[in-house]
Amino acid sequence: MRIGTILCFLSIFLNTTLNAQKKLEVRLLSSGTNTSLRGMSIPSEQVIWVSGSNGTIGKSVDGGTSWKWIIVPGFEKKDFRDIEAFDSSTAIAMAVDNPAYMVKTIDGGVTWKKVFERAMEGMFLDAMDFRNEKEGICIGDPVDVNGMNRRLFYIIRTFDGGETWKEAPMYHMPAAQIGEAIFSASGTNISFLTNPDFEYAFVTGGTASNLYMVGRQGKKSKVVATPLLQGKETTGTFSMATDKQKTIYCIGGDYKVPGGYFDNYSYTTDAGNKWVSPSISPPFGYRSCIRIIKDKTLVACGPTGVDFAANGQKEWRKASLESFNVCMVSKGKQVFLAGEKGKIGRLSYQ
């Protein structure tokens, strides 16, 4: 009886595990472009915007079934590494390098207007985040803003929905360490916070991988080292995600070693005082993007595949071997991904 009972429970466990694994699947969608994609925004269940190289921006209004592609006039040689959209009509795209630009459309991409331009040695924008439809922030690589040989992380802000952008006060532009920079891998290394002490945070890489938390008015800012791989130009934290419980998730690695899974993921629940890193099953390689699907359920992607964690952030499962640069989650918990050669996919996890 005892052996039979054990075998019965073992059979149930194996069947349950296999069935659970079958629920993870990435379905590729036909996009109609061959452009590298790194930016994505999902303002509703049906509306998806993506952005990429050669001035390319794409939009779907039917949940990814069909796509309309736009080459923004005058920006044919620019990389749009990030995009933020509010609906099917309004979107803001970020063109990264010197000179850096922001462009905005309010008619679904038919026309675009330049809302920001900045030329400066070393200028390179990396990521945006919006708190709501009015207030947004953008961060770039460290530059010598005032000609005093101090490399400060370049930060600009908008309070009118991206119509105008202004440089943040210099005391809100932290100084970078030698060899420290920000990666423009997926537009996800800066985020507004719900923390009462800190307004927003961003993550860095290179010779140092740090988490910077900028204090709210009257509060002190804070910088802490992350436990992620660092020390070379190609290493560090490439993406971050935050939840309402003040947890900050960091992911990255070494983009020159796409299959390397050592020191590529960690999270903190107390503003960096203590970090938790999985010792048994970390993400399966360098990852360029991490997003929260729902409470303690995460998705991450990179050149060697898509990973999924549903058990308190500590154990990751392989969802797909398909390569993607960026993943985003809709309000209805749909997960879409985009990557090289126009690849777009949707993750099924239920």
Predicted segments, located by residue:
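Residue-level hotspots at or immediately adjacent to binding/recognition sites across diverse folds
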Residues: Q21-Q350
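Bacterial Sec-dependent N-terminal signal peptides
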Residues: M1-E25
